Curated annotation (Swiss-Prot):
Belongs to the succinate/malate CoA ligase beta subunit family. It catalyses: succinate + ATP + CoA = succinyl-CoA + ADP + phosphate; GTP + succinate + CoA = succinyl-CoA + GDP + phosphate. Substrate binds at residues 264, 321-323. It comes from Xanthomonas axonopodis pv. citri (strain 306). Succinyl-CoA synthetase functions in the citric acid cycle (TCA), coupling the hydrolysis of succinyl-CoA to the synthesis of either ATP or GTP and thus represents the only step of substrate-level phosphorylation in the TCA. The beta subunit provides nucleotide specificity of the enzyme and binds the substrate succinate, while the binding sites for coenzyme A and phosphate are found in the alpha subunit. Keywords: ATP-binding, Ligase, Magnesium, Metal-binding, Nucleotide-binding, Tricarboxylic acid cycle. Its cofactor is Mg(2+). This is Succinate--CoA ligase [ADP-forming] subunit beta.
Length: 389
């Protein structure tokens, strides 16, 4: 789950990490009220969407007067914005964040994440903040510093001070940096986060460090014990079909192709998409219907797939281990009838009660195309889509 900047800053502040004073507003007049409550300007007005790159897209404005604040908020609120991170998708701007604006002396980068390669929690820091860290890594990798945290020792103050001196900070600032690192480690663990990125972590004209922007990503598997984070979810920033799928507890990800996939098991689902690609097709989605699939679940999965008007064919690839193939077949037949499927449907069944499942499909009288294996199914669905075009 992703978070808005204002939500990230709220969490950072709760854990003692300095952030500029600010508050969100839903209307231009509210934005002016917030600005006045923060004292004399200048201020920053920032569009709240689940994406970076807002500045280049016109979503971050420096304002010297409250008239500027009102104009900036009016221009953003109620509109949609796309950035280089949204892949052309426009996200609605329902809120703006109004903050104080100090003069930036230096921009740094700091993040904490789970490094699967080293199997540790890892800090990444750089003296080059305010830009994409991938760009820094590619052009000046010597400016990137990493720390793999020992699970027994945890992160200590001396780790932060050492990092701070590597980034060119003075003794006072290195001490602040150490405090931020220690508090960030506590936040990361207590909130079951997968990533926290502060970019930039800036030195302002008062000589102190502030988190000017924050990007969070949480571990959805821990949502059951993170009620505060779940309450922060903004479904307006998410793909509508993916939101519906999450409410049905179906693992679904929208993609750009035209061949819908319904599979049980994440590994088999990824393999299915790969084989479709190898046969010249383009998957329209990742959909893991799960090991506990039943007839109604299969119907809902078909509805999810067909909610996209880009889908021109469907490949159902089921390995019946926990789930029974005959039950899946019943769900497919019911779904085709209920949903009114008008695109080619290719079905590959294997495993428990496979013969019963295949017989049900044959007896249904429906134009369901059987497949013997995953490659055969991928070839047939790609061919069926081409022939139907």
């Amino acid at each position: 789950m992703n978070f808005h900047e204002y939500q990230s800053k709220q969490l950072l502040a709760e854990y003692g990490i300095p952030v500029p004073a600010g508050k969100v507003a839903a209307t231009p007049d509210e934005a002016v009220e917030v600005a006045n409550s923060l004292g004399n300007g200048p201020w920053m007005v920032k569009a709240q969407i689940h994406a970076g790159g807002r500045g280049k897209a016109g979503g971050v404005k420096f304002c010297k007067t409250t008239d500027d604040v009102k104009a900036a908020a009016a221009k953003m609120l109620g509109t949609k914005m796309s950035t280089y991170q949204t892949a052309g998708v426009e996200l609605p701007i329902n809120l703006v964040l109004v903050t104080t604006a100090g003069e930036i002396v230096k921009e740094l980068y700091l993040s904490i994440l789970v490094d699967r390669g080293t199997k540790t929690i890892t800090y990444i820091a750089s003296s080059e903040g305010g830009v994409e860290i991938e760009q820094v890594a590619a052009e000046t990798p010597e400016l990137i510093h990493a720390l793999n945290v020992d699970f027994v020792e945890g992160v200590q103050g001396y780790h932060g001070r050492d990092f701070g001196f590597k980034l060119g900070l003075n003794a006072k600032q290195a001490g602040q940096f150490a405090s931020i690192m220690v508090n960030l480690y506590k936040l990361f663990n207590e909130k079951d986060l997968a990533l926290v990125e502060i970019n930039p972590l800036a030195i302002l004209d008062d000589g102190n460090l502030y988190a000017l922007d924050g990007k969070f990503d949480s571990d959805d598997n821990a949502a059951f014990r993170q009620k505060q984070l779940v309450a922060m979810r903004d479904k307006t920033q998410e793909d509508e079909t993916e939101v519906t799928a999450s409410e049905l507890d179906i693992n679904y990800v929208t993609m750009d192709g035209n061949i819908g996939c319904m599979v049980n098991g994440a590994g088999l689902a990824m393999a299915t998409m790969d084989v479709i690609k190898l046969n010249g097709g383009e998957p329209a989605n990742f959909l893991d219907v799960g090991g506990g699939a039943n007839k109604q679940r299969v119907i809902e999965a078909f509805k999810l797939i067909l909610s996209s008007d880009k889908v021109e064919g469907i490949f159902v690839n089921i390995f019946g281990g926990i789930v029974r193939c005959d039950m899946i077949a019943e769900g497919i037949i019911a779904a085709v009838k209920e949903v009114g499927v008008k695109v080619p449907v290719v079905v590959r069944l294997e495993g428990t009660n496979v013969e019963e499942g295949k017989q049900l499909l044959r007896d249904s009288g429906m134009a369901i195309i059987p497949a013997d294996n995953i490659n055969d199914g991928a070839k047939k669905v790609v061919e069926a889509v081409k022939n139907a075009a």
